[in-house]
């Protein structure tokens, strides 16, 4: 089962929305970043950047909300536009990540 490490910030919320809308079963794992749980050795073994969100799918570990969204879209085939429209989707996804994201 997918493990989803998160807090209540906007970037983990994007991933939570995808998981819910796709109907994927997952285990939510809250990370209290206000208390510094992301800096624990156990968490840094999963994500050396010490940030949420992180998705663990079997032996596959993906961090960064947009990387997770793309991984899940490719894995499930959901929410992906036709190949000739993906460039526009990638452009907007990266713009949100680097242009207006938190």
Name each model feature, range by range.
Residues 1-102:
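GST-like domain detector, emphasizing the conserved glutathione-binding G-site
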